[in-house]
Amino acid sequence: MYLTIIFLFISSIIFPLLFFLGKHLSNFRYPNLPPGKIGFPLIGETLSFLSAGRQGHPEKFVTDRVRHFSSGIFKTHLFGSPFAVVTGASGNKFLFTNENKLVISWWPDSVNKIFPSSTQTSSKEEAIKTRMLLMPSMKPEALRRYVGVMDEIAQKHFETEWANQDQLIVFPLTKKFTFSIACRLFLSMDDLERVRKLEEPFTTVMTGVFSIPIDLPGTRFNRAIKASRLLSKEVSTIIRQRKEELKAGKVSVEQDILSHMLMNIGETKDEDLADKIIALLIGGHDTTSIVCTFVVNYLAEFPHIYQRVLEEQKEILNNKDVNEKLTWEDIEKMRYSWNVACEVMRIVPPLAGTFREAIDHFSFKGFYIPKGWKLYWSATATHKNPEYFPEPEKFEPSRFEGSGPKPYTYVPFGGGSRICPGREYARLEILIFMHNLVKRFKWEKVFPKENKLVADPAPIPAKGLPIRIFPQS
């Protein structure tokens, strides 16, 4: 009897392990697959992939394997799925031009669990719907009316958060700035206390999306699920209130992005629309806060570049009345400032890369990619390829003068039909931040030689970028 119990106990452990091992290996029994390693059952090479980012070199996972296999493509196993990782301009072009033909957007299962939908549609289908709803609000003709509002928020931000400070940490403040703008433009929310209440759970959700999806108390994933529920409840309340205001004619459809979506989305549960808004708020502030942070970093490191940015912004100021807000025409004159921001995004892409799923069998560079496999493309590895950018570690905004980089070599916003719909929104936000920053302040890094970053999942300075700040004379 005792031996039988032991046998059953051991069998209950071994047989599931053998099943998962067999399933794990069966994914890689196709002919002529790309070279590469599959790692351990279930987790594959996920820990190595995440560890590279947390150690400050998110491109290292890709570049080390590209160098080892010399194929421009390799296989691995990430987030519970078999993966092909494609690299370089040719890989980017292949994925971007075959969107919805051979590949579609894909996110780890953790996304569906953090943002559960009450509908039968997948996160991919929901993302397409959200994208279609957002597009009209992100066109230049729609964004023009936001410039003055963004400028006003920026002025208040620097007055309340930066002025009269001797020393501060940049990253938390850029997140506060971009989140305030997102809340104002998406939800007409300008109550600072309410904005602060939402900011922390947004950060918790973002860090949990690419964590190991183990829903146990205390894990990142578990905290992200709880934070998502809290956000959904709060945003659903805002949605119900806005519906009543629109019905009563108290607000305009043009007031903000939420009002526009409500008038065009049709029958949708408040909770599902709340998830769409939450996703937009994450996308609308998280990546741009990273760019703004590293703009501060590189302008501190290169005083001659700071000076050129300052001169460009002074020229714009000299043609405006005191207290006159920025306009779209002013933004269009910030060419050198935008070159600086572009070089920041080349060296530190706010998204290291994204995922796709093969919806059919196909070949790339002579290797077979099975239907159902996932794919990953790396912006960081492409941007630091000396074939495309000589001396890739050198900060050189002139790379973006004239015709700029060759197609598919510079991809901070992705490309093809899936190119980021908010790229013009991001450009406005970054340039308005730069304008208000340099016109008011000079600064220096507290730790001049400290350049370590941590990608978890997005890249941030390891210490948040402490600076000493001085009023502009």
UniProtKB/Swiss-Prot annotation:
Its EC number is 1.14.-.-. One of its GO terms (biological process) is saponin biosynthetic process. InterPro entries: Cyt_P450, Cyt_P450_CS, Cyt_P450_E_grp-I, Cyt_P450_sf. Pfam families: p450. Keywords: Heme, Iron, Membrane, Metal-binding, Monooxygenase, Oxidoreductase, Transmembrane, Transmembrane helix. Gene3D superfamilies: Cytochrome P450. The chain crosses the membrane at residues 1-21. Its cofactor is heme. GO terms for cellular component: membrane. It is found in: Membrane. It is a single-pass membrane protein. Possesses triterpene oxidizing activity. Catalyzes the C28 hydroxylation of alpha-amyrin, beta-amyrin, and lupeol, producing uvaol, erythrodiol, and betulin, respectively. Catalyzes the C28 carboxylation of alpha- and beta-amyrin. Possesses 22alpha-hydroxylation activity against alpha- and beta-amaryn. Belongs to the cytochrome P450 family. This is Cytochrome P450 716A2. It comes from Arabidopsis thaliana. The lineage of its organism: Eukaryota, Viridiplantae, Streptophyta, Embryophyta, Tracheophyta. The gene is CYP716A2.
